[in-house]
């Protein structure tokens, strides 16, 4: 290897940090803590990482190594291993999953803005839901308008705000552990951390919440293009992924322990209203309390909220634009999409595609106008995203199984495991875990939330089948 080639290679440790900032976030800690009865989530985190995340990450490494020249991600992998039709469905799923994600970004923006301005949870929650949802819908339309201009003016701001939020998440853990020594007279929760107290109650609520953890640890396929840029990929990549897993496990456990000194699970689960409030506000309360421990008032919370304001708006715009381009710009799958959706405006943007995003995401936003309470809306969106977003991971595991079926014809510099049976078992295992968690996650005691969790993925799936039929009808008519 020449000196120039060595200079362009990245170390396994650099890869681990790149992947960590992509996969992990402070919201994963707070959601796990709230949904899994505080410190009891530690048990679930450990098993989720050992039996799901590590094999998932290593399978992605093998896929990235085998298709190092393919830039289309999962859709390209399936096109190479199966056929164009399945590649289309993978691309469609990736785009469709973002419909619910886009619907949640406007609410996240308003919540962050409210905390930055009013510095409390009560003001936002006191507004009538229909007004909040109307404002959220207007933010969606604003995001669609900016995306239709072909501009990504907030991309650099997103990077800066995302980095700031990421750094603050790590600082939170360090500063929270140091707080008792600095401010010993402050009020801290004394959590029971005995082994027996950490074993969760395996009931319906537990199993229907597992999709939250699957959603939290997913997304590492985004780093697959870097597999062959790592020094000695066959050894460097798995080392980087194992390091990533250790970092994420450590962050999840230490973050949970830090939060257990602040929040009492009994208070969180005291009522449905209390639970909804913690789902919507726990991250802001965490930084607000941290500021009180260090005698700086609401400073940490305001910084976190302002970073979130920028991030939520920027992610909204990028989530409208990027998945749509991945779906409609793929030459291999254009034949399955009606020509009307390929319409490009003067800025090179698929204008009709953006209109479809506005209609579908807007429908979810407006449907939630009838939900009693803004905090309940955010809880619904958190659960809905945990049901829909992991569905795109199913195609990763399908692509991996297809790759192993073509073991002799598609070479890869890095292999997760050499044994075919073991490799296919893990591919099938991760596929099954994802599918089961998504289906179980649909259940909710609230009938409206349950209906939303079922109807949304069903409608998006049906629409994914309808488009190829419309495209085929167009092509048949054009031949006559």
What feature does the model see in each segment?
Residues 93-109, 222-226, 295-338, 391-400, ...:
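Membrane-helix boundary/coupling elements in multi-pass transport proteins
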Residues 7-13, 133-134, 231-233, 243-248, ...:
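Loop-to-transmembrane helix boundary motifs in multi-pass membrane proteins
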Residues 1-43, 47, 52-61, 69, ...:
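Membrane-interface "cap" regions at the ends of multi-pass membrane proteins
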Residues 5-8, 43, 123, 127-130, ...:
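Helix-loop-helix junctions that connect adjacent transmembrane segments
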Residues 5-7, 343-347, 390-444:
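C-terminal membrane-solvent junction of multi-pass transporters and transport-like membrane proteins
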């Amino acid at each position: 290897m020449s000196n120039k080639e060595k200079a362009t290679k990245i170390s396994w440790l650099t890869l681990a940090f790149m992947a960590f900032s992509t996969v992990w976030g402070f919201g994963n800690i707070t959601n796990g803590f709230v949904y899994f009865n505080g410190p009891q989530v530690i048990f679930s985190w450990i098993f989720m990482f050992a039996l799901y995340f590590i094999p998932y990450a290593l399978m992605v490494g093998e896929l990235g190594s085998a298709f190092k020249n393919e830039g289309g991600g999962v859709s390209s992998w399936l096109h190479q291993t199966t056929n164009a039709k399945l590649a289309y469905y993978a691309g469609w799923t990736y785009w469709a999953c973002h419909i619910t994600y886009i619907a949640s970004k406007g609410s996240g923006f308003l919540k962050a803005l409210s905390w930055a301005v009013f510095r409390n949870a009560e003001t936002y929650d006191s507004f009538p839901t229909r007004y909040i949802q109307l404002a959220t819908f207007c933010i969606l339309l604003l995001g669609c308008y900016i995306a239709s201009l072909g501009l990504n003016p907030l991309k650099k701001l997103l990077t800066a705000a995302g980095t700031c939020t990421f750094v603050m998440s790590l600082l939170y853990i360090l500063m929270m552990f140091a707080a008792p020594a600095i401010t010993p007279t402050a009020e801290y929760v004394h959590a029971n951390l005995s082994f027996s107290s950490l074993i969760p109650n395996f009931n319906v609520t537990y199993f229907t919440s597992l999709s939250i953890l699957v959603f939290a640890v997913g997304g590492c396929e985004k780093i697959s293009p870097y597999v062959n840029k790592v020094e000695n990929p066959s050894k460097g990549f798995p080392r980087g992924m194992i390091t990533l897993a250790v970092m994420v496990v450590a962050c999840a456990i230490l973050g949970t322990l830090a939060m257990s000194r602040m929040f009492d699970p009994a208070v969180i689960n005291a009522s449905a209203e209390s639970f909804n409030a913690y789902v919507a506000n726990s991250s802001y309360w965490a930084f607000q309390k941290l500021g009180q421990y260090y005698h700086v008032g609401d400073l940490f919370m305001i910084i976190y909220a302002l970073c979130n304001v920028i991030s939520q708006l920027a992610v909204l715009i990028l989530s409208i634009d990027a998945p749509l381009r991945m779906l409609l710009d793929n030459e291999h799958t254009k034949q399955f999409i009606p020509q009307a959706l390929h319409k490009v405006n003067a800025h090179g943007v698929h204008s009709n595609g953006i209109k479809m995003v506005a209609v579908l995401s807007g429908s979810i936003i407006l449907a939630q106008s009838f939900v009693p309470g803004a905090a309940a809306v955010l809880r619904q969106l958190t659960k809905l995203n945990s049901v829909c977003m992991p569905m795109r991971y199913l195609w990763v595991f399908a692509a991996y199984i297809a790759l192993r079926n073509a073991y002799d014809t598609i070479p890869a510099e890095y292999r997760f495991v050499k044994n075919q049976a073991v490799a296919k078992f893990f591919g099938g295992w991760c596929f099954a875990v994802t599918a089961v968690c998504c289906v179980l996650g649909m259940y909710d005691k609230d009938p409206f939330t349950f209906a939303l969790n079922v109807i949304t993925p069903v409608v998006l799936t049906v629409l994914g089948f309808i488009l190829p039929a419309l495209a085929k009808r167009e092509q048949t008519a054009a031949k006559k």
